[in-house]
């Protein structure tokens, strides 16, 4: 059974893991590098025992690492104490009626003032101490809109209040995910992908057993991570060149990407595919529930998985 990430993040592969994971090479004895790990869904659910989670989003990566090193029961208790401290709703104990709400309208009205106080306290401590309180951060994710992890350009967490709370389903999702994460020999790195790959190539520990999975920002999408110029053509070219170097060194890789999005195409990726002997698999995915894709009758996204090994 797939362990779903207990918070939402742009570009999650949770919805296609049933297609993606069977395309991975045999994982016994391999080290998986999840080069753009995001919320960790791929690394957590892959069969590899040793997983390197790498991502430049330090809040996201730091939360994963904190969950890995903290006993599940202690983390759960700390979150529940935080909820009680700020007076946030506990529908799993008291039900919706206790808060004058129902499951349709949700709990946003009841939680808004307490949520904003928690958000202000988190941002203030982050600014003053230069560190993150991951219990407060995860509590914000629970009560935030769509459980989204979002920061503004000034580094402040700015997700608005949502309509749900730490219900039984959310608690189960958290515990299941943490148990699966803890079953791995997990390592964490917050490096630019170029630096990460250089370090991996120089490591004797990983020699001969490395598999690199890449789910980079997609050059032609309008996802949040590209709205501020977070991924450009040079990044795309550098990543594809790095994958060629992995192939030349006999290292297996897998790349998730998008060749077409609405009326746009990715000529850099298409030319690379055309001029290389790599295998290309079409991935079927619906974006109907995504918060960052336009919903029009002409919308089309062509997602692919590209590998340098025989499937």
Residue ranges and their predicted role:
Residues 1-36, 41-42, 46:
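S-adenosyl-L-methionine
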Residues 20, 32-46, 53-58, 138-145, ...:
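Conserved proline-anchored active-site loop of SAM-dependent methyltransferases
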Residues 49-184:
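Class I S-adenosyl-L-methionine-dependent methyltransferase module
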Residues 153-165, 218-238:
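Mobile active-site "lid"/loop adjacent to the S-adenosyl-L-methionine
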Residues 173-187, 241-254:
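A structural motif corresponding to the C-terminal end of an alpha-helix
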Residues 190-196:
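Conserved SAM/SAH-binding loop
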Residues 197-207:
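Short amphipathic alpha-helix with an adjacent loop that forms part of the alpha/beta core around
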Residues 219, 228-311:
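Long, positively charged, glycine-interspersed low-complexity recognition regions
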């Amino acid at each position: 059974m797939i362990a779903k990430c207990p918070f939402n993040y742009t570009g999650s592969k949770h919805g296609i893991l049933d297609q993606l994971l069977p395309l991975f090479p045999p994982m016994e004895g391999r080290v998986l590098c999840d080069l753009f790990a995001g919320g960790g869904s791929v690394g957590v659910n892959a069969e590899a025992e040793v997983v390197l989670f790498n991502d430049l989003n330090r809040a996201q990566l730091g939360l994963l690492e904190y969950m890995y090193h903290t006993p599940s029961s202690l983390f759960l208790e700390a979150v529940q104490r935080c909820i009680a401290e700020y007076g946030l709703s506990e529908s799993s104990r008291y039900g919706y009626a206790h808060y004058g709400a129902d499951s349709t309208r949700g709990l946003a009205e009841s939680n808004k003032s307490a949520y904003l106080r928690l958000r202000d306290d988190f941002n203030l401590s982050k600014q003053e101490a230069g560190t993150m309180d991951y219990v407060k951060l995860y509590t914000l994710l629970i009560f935030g809109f769509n459980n989204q992890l979002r920061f503004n350009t000034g580094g402040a967490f700015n997700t608005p209040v949502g309509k749900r709370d730490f219900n039984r389903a959310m608690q189960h999702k958290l515990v299941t995910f943490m148990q699966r994460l803890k079953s791995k020999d997990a390592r964490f790195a917050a490096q630019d992908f170029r630096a990460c790959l250089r370090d991996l190539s120089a490591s004797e520990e990983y020699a001969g057993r490395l598999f690199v999975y890449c789910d980079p920002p997609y050059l032609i999408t309008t996802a949040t991570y590209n709205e501020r110029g977070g991924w450009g053509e040079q990044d795309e070219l550098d990543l594809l060149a790095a994958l060629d170097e992995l192939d030349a060194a006999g290292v297996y890789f897998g790349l998730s990407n998008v060749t077409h999005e609405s009326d746009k195409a990715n000529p850099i990726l298409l030319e690379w595919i055309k001029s290389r002997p790599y295998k290309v698999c079409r991935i079927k995915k619906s974006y109907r529930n995504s918060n960052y894709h336009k919903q029009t009758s002409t919308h089309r996204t062509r997602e692919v998985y590209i590998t340098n090994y025989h499937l």
